[in-house]
């Protein structure tokens, strides 16, 4: 028996509902998605293997919401708060139900720390078609994620490799600090699946390369000027307190950015 098939037997022995549970374990070990106390939304959660792993890792202070068109059987004695939403993730009513569960954010983004998706299309055996359908599912999940994620939040979704992958990544990248491709060891050797891990949701009004006018309101401990762009903090090098200058955004983080004056 191959090591890949062995994951199926391990899942049965260890009480996981699907072998995909090990993929999420490996993704979390690699990318740090499921920290203690985080609020997690699992899209396309049935039968619940990813929910089992998420519940173990976010602990009693966490909140976990499983979303699927199918009924998800309740987890056995989970530590965190666990809720189930039966519905279409693209419908406003479904997103409203999620928000009712997790509440509103205190920050500039949504109320959720992590959105994960292991969804796959019904397979046709036609590689290009299956790839295109998987890309469409990721785009739908991405739309939900950008609506729900708080500043600094993370997004992880399965996609099949193919010709549209680069365009998909290019569309996701501006909304996060970075995006990487991860292929868990638990994926079958014959599978073209990979996971896009997008870290640190950006909700500020600026992006890398933007040129904006900034008034320096203070000087920080490191000597950089401190400006506000729509209440978003921008650190500007080589300026003095009280100056109003055009600056180019060099780097963007979830809660602040770095810039230099335009010469």
Curated annotation (Swiss-Prot):
The active site is at 158 (proton acceptor). Its EC number is 2.1.1.166. It is found in: Cytoplasm. S-adenosyl-L-methionine binds at residues 48, 50, 68, 88, 118. The keyword Methyltransferase applies. GO terms for cellular component: cytoplasm. It catalyses: uridine(2552) in 23S rRNA + S-adenosyl-L-methionine = 2'-O-methyluridine(2552) in 23S rRNA + S-adenosyl-L-homocysteine + H(+). Residues 205-263 form the TRAM domain. HAMAP family: RNA_methyltr_E. This is Ribosomal RNA large subunit methyltransferase E. It comes from Haloarcula marismortui (strain ATCC 43049 / DSM 3752 / JCM 8966 / VKM B-1809).
């Amino acid at each position: 028996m191959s090591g890949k098939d062995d994951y199926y037997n391990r899942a049965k022995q260890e009480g996981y509902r699907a072998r995909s549970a090990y993929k999420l374990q490996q993704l979390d070990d690699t990318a740090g998605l499921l920290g203690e106390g985080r609020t997690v939304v699992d899209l396309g959660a049935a039968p619940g293997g990813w929910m089992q792993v998420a519940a173990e890792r976010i602990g009693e202070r966490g909140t976990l919401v499983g979303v699927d068109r199918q009924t998800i059987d309740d987890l056995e004695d989970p530590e965190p708060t666990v809720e189930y939403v039966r519905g279409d993730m693209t419908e406003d009513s479904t997103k409203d139900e999620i928000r009712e569960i997790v509440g509103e954010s205190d920050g500039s983004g949504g109320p959720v720390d992590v959105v994960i998706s292991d969804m796959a299309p019904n397979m046709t055996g036609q590689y290009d078609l299956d790839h295109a359908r998987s890309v469409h599912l990721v785009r739908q999940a991405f739309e939900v994620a950008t609506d729900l994620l708080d500043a600094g939040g993370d997004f992880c979704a399965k996609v099949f490799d193919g010709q549209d992958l680069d365009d998909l990544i290019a569309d996701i990248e501006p909304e996060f600090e970075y995006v990487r491709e991860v292929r868990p060891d638990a994926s079958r050797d014959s599978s073209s699946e990979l996971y896009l891990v997008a870290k640190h949701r950006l909700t500020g009004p600026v992006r890398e390369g933007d040129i904006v006018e900034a008034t320096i309101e203070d000087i920080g401990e490191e000597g950089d000027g401190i400006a506000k762009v729509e209440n978003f903090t921008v650190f500007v090098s080589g300026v003095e307190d009280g100056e109003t200058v055009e600056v180019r955004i060099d780097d963007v983080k979830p809660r602040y950015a770095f810039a230099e004056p335009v010469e």
